[in-house]
């Protein structure tokens, strides 16, 4: 955990730093109290990153360029458009959020596409 944040900051676990990851960013944010900002409002215009959030525990309220998403434990929220302004607030103490981000084009899968012919995609309808 990163020590020394502001009193109203969530606990920050820099997974990318801990494991020395270089292909994508990964962090876990844990709310000390309810109504605590887990992800400050921002966009990724400068970096071009796509971001994926997974609620590990508790519940969070996401705001995505004006749209609101209520996410409970096990919910994933994907933000593929870097221009979308995003933020997340914990709805309960102990809410834990995994955040993963990477710039477009930095990942090439080694999986065989035929394994997924029967697996639906979020953007398929």
Predicted feature locations:
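Short acidic-glycine-tyrosine-enriched beta hairpin
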Residues: 65-83
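Double-stranded beta-helix
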Residues: 89-125
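Residue-level recognition of conserved beta-strand positions in structured domain cores
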Residues: 28, 56-57, 64-66, 90, ...
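Short, conserved beta-strand element in jelly-roll/cupin
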Residues: 45-62
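Short, conserved secondary-structure segments in the cores of folded domains
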Residues: 51, 67-68, 87
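Short beta-strand His + acidic residue motifs that chelate non-heme Fe in jelly-roll/DSBH
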Residues: 62-63, 79, 85-92, 108
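Short, surface-exposed beta-edge/turn micro-motifs
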Residues: 23, 49-52, 94-95
């Amino acid at each position: 955990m990163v020590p020394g944040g502001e009193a109203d900051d969530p606990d920050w676990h820099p997974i990318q730093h801990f494991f020395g990851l270089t292909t994508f960013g990964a962090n876990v944010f844990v709310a000390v109290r309810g109504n605590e900002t887990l992800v400050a409002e921002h966009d990724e215009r400068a970096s071009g990153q796509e971001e994926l959030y997974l609620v590990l525990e508790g519940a969070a309220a996401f705001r995505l360029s004006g749209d609101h998403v209520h996410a409970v434990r096990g919910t994933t929220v994907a933000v593929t458009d870097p221009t979308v302004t995003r933020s997340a607030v914990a709805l309960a103490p102990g809410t834990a959020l995994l955040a993963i981000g990477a710039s477009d084009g930095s990942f090439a899968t080694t999986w065989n596409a035929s394994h997924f012919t029967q697996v639906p995609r979020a953007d398929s309808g």
